[in-house]
Amino acid sequence: MIMPTASELIRHHHAHPLDFESVREVPDSHAWPDLHDHPTASAQGAVVPVIDLSATATNVLEQLARACESWGAFQVTGHGVPPGLLRRVEAAARGVFALPTNRKLEAARPADGVSGYGRARISCFFPKLMWSEGFTIAGSPVDHARTLWPDDDALAFCDVIEEYKEEMKQLARKLMRMMLMSLGLTEAEAEAETETGWIGPGDEAGGMSAVLQLNSYPVCPDPDRAMGMAAHTDSTLLTLLFQSNTSGLQVLQVVGDTGRDRAARWVTVPPMPGALIVNVGDLFQILSNGRYRSVIHRAVVNRTSHRVSVAYMCGPPAASKVEPIVKLVGPGSGPVYRPVTWPEYLSVKGKLFDKALASVMRTEVSLEHT
């Protein structure tokens, strides 16, 4: 599934990752001075919601609304993705990152491309580098797979990736419908949005676009000085994340009202066997007219376990405008955000990063918030 024109718009930092196996200490280039910008909640404290999608529909919709309004993220069980497929896609990801560095660099992401091996694209927004490496798959994985492995191994890798992408596509469409219904749309209205509206069946000519991102967080000799993935929001509708059995994902929970009582803390999302994590993306925040907020999240590293994660990042067709759903715009208040395409928003995010959402607010709304 190809995201048209995105390769022309995503031109972020593309330098090669560090050869992590060759270093015994964190170099200054990767030493972060502000890892503790917010406190981290204790393991017995706040918990990111877990939602069983096989439960009663009404109950699930209520839970989705609370999770999206309060957290912008949640874990799902009862999603129907075979556990064996999750194990195989984790093994496929580990197989990529276990290759020698010189082999991985043969599949390096070009400066003007989307797919391939390299650093996180958000690297250019930070003065320090991250303790991670990534492999992005937009469209078919065949070309890069043949660069990395002999034909039989490449075919096996591609089979797993394509099967996983298909499962994620179906789950993403299901979640989109349910989340729209949790906002107050009827089943017919949600169905119209996901089947006949701009979120269509999901082929190249129309429907949801998607990119699959494999992430690697190698063992770190000094995790208190390194950052796996810096804090950010996703430029998507939804991101479906499989984080295997090693913790590292943290989401930022804002507690209290505005003013002095307002505070934020990092909450670790514990791995759950077979569960998937759902992040609300920037585009869904626009779609919901700001009711559901995209979640700020990051990844921390550890000194004992090599962590991998697999993120399915989905959005609308490149030519489709994303704007607040009319039914969600209150009388007399107007939409908070102006219409924007996914490529247009990626271009804005590539320049403004964490100020991108504010930049697509309507002028009169922006003035009210200044």
Q: Predicted segments — roles?
A:
Residues 1-370:
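Peripheral, non-catalytic segments flanking oxidoreductase cores
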